[in-house]
Amino acid sequence: MSDGPETAEGDTDDAVQDAAVNSRVASESSARSQPRATVVGCLPPTPFAIHTTPAPSEHSKEKNVSRRLPTEKTPSRLATPQFPPTPVSSRGSIAEPSAYPSITQALRSCLPPQKDIEILLSNLSSMSIFCYKSSFKLCSSWPSEMTEEQIPIANLLYSETHPVLLARHMLLFAVGLQHLSPTKAIPGLTRHHRAIMEQLADSAIKLVNTDDVLLGTLEGLENLILESFYHIDGGNIRRAWITMRRAVMTAQLLGLHRPGHYRFKTVNKQNDLDPAVMWACIVSTEQFLCLLLGLPTSTSGASFTIPRATSACVESGNLPVLIPDVVRKIIERNQTHVPQEALDMTQKIDHELLGVVKQWPPAFWRPLQLSGLEVDSADAFWETRRAWDHIFYYSLVNQLHLPYMLNPSHVSQKVYSRIACASASREILIRQIAIRTFNPVTAGCRMGDFVALIAGMTLMLAHILSHCSKGTENLLVHQRVGDRATVERALECMESMSEQHEDILTAKCAALLKNLLDIEAGPAEARSDDGQKDDQNVLVVKVPHVGAIKIARDGISITPFDTEQEQVSHDGVTIGGFGSIHVSTPHDSDRDGDHQADVVTPNDTASQATTQVVRPASARKQWRPVSQRSSGDVFTLPEETFPDASAGMEEWLFQGLDTAFFDVLISGAGEQPLNSTDTEGWNFVMSP
């Protein structure tokens, strides 16, 4: 007998429900009924969520995207599809909640009071479950094709007896709370809803998700995926990556990487989890996080096939199903050390991406139509999901061509890649701005914020490089004003998110983009009225094993690591994960007189200059000074200052997205690390 909850029938009255609850209290091992659960959810949390579709009927094949958009008759809430789970060769069921009484009791002790649960449920009752189902559960492609049966979602008033199922409810409830505005005041609560959210998530993660014994079921794997999405929407990309790595290992132990040879167990026989869809989600999510962070993937040889994923996926715009291997191929290209081989791979992947565009109907690429839609409506979800497919596609174009933006070895490819990156970045920013303008409160779509950061940096660097061209060689001159306005609007969205969520990451994103905007303003603005050169904002990036890039109004230059220069300390904003980015501003220069640095030799770390890292006012921790070693305009973070891999948001700062970006930008594809004789072609000087 399963310990999982069974979905109540739609016509079950309150009396029957109360009787069922009393029966459960009397005997937890007996079958029980649960009231219709509140529907909770969010907008799509990631641009790579897996959306599978059933085989289309003859009638559905005649429909195009525009005709299949939700209408006013479309159900507003997602319903459970009637497809059975994928057949497995070895599948068991666990029905022993009594084996973990201490864990269950510990989880229940972390639940908020019943009054708080009731109040929070009433505030979450209008939100949809779309992102939860579209992320890793088998669901129909369009609301009109779904049944009327509602999906039961976490109602902590009727807590589970098995710790895995109870942890699932706690994580789902936390995800729902995550999409309430942090500034929203909910009367009647004993604690702020964000504190309740953090306690629910932390307890489920520490007591269940970190216990390997409880990860041998599909439901345990589901909890890891939920945890990863929770970290993504919380802005902690590194912890999401670590969690997804654990999900990869767990899924492999359950045999999900071998269709037809599964060996997993389930806690609840009535669950609708599909192992093939879960594996596809895990692989695509892990690979995309690796691409953004500049880390190697653990699923390079993995493949997945979605059952019932037919040509209907093309109509619905299910991009991860159509091009599941592109992310992996880009990561492999980035790790190639033969320039010609890397160039051939780049051109082949580019051709593959262009082929994907031809598969989709023209209506799929029409401008977004979010105006006038309700935030939690089905129409808004499908439109946002389409925007996510766009962002995902253009982010792949960006990542593919970044290595050739600065590379002097391939002139023709450099021009093509620079235009491709600028165009893709522009499209990403436009769509992310539309999403944030439509719903500026929710913590969802956080992955889009990170992708938009990379897009904004790329677009500004493309214009800075264009200033180094003369006359008609500046191919972006007519787009400059519009692109600057787009980046500035993206900044406003980032600052709004930072203020609402006390988010250090978005605050750092805004600070960096502001400096790039100021640098891009041009050499003419760098001089004062009397003709004297004014102080500049200078962006200096050190990338491990590659070199240091200096971006200023007078151009871009790269310094190899083995260049010996006088060691000077500078105050400024230091950010970074594996390396560091240092922004030196005129205001910092004014303060340098009071902070003279000691000269540091490679063997003398005792005399390192100490600077205070600048933090936004929203930071919730008191930061200690960070010791730095500097060489000219090169700034490093000593090894002991790096936080643990699972550290919180404050410790990780930029999460490594910054240095991963510049690592690819500077090193190129298939190129060897720079040395003192290789930098001449990499220096760009502004044209007068």
Curated annotation (Swiss-Prot):
InterPro entries: Transcription_factor_dom_fun
Entry keyword annotation includes Zinc-finger: no
Biased composition (Polar residues): 24-36
Single annotated GO MF: DNA binding
The keyword NAD appears for this protein: no
SMART domains on file: Fungal_trans (SM00906)
Composition bias type Acidic residues, residue spans: 1-16
Industrial and biotechnological uses noted in the record: Griseofulvin is a spirocyclic fungal natural product used in treatment of fungal dermatophytes.
Entry function: Probable transcription factor that regulates expression of the gene cluster that mediates the biosynthesis of Griseofulvin, an important antifungal drug that has been in use for a long time for treating dermatophyte infections.
Biased composition regions of type Basic and acidic residues, renumbered to the chain: 58-75
Localization, UniProt: Nucleus
Main location: nucleus
Full protein name: Probable transcription factor gsfR1
GO cellular component: nucleus
Region: Disordered, residue numbers: 1-95
Keyword annotations from UniProtKB, A to Z: Nucleus, Transcription, Transcription regulation
Signal sequence, start to end: none
Biological process terms in GO annotation: DNA-templated transcription
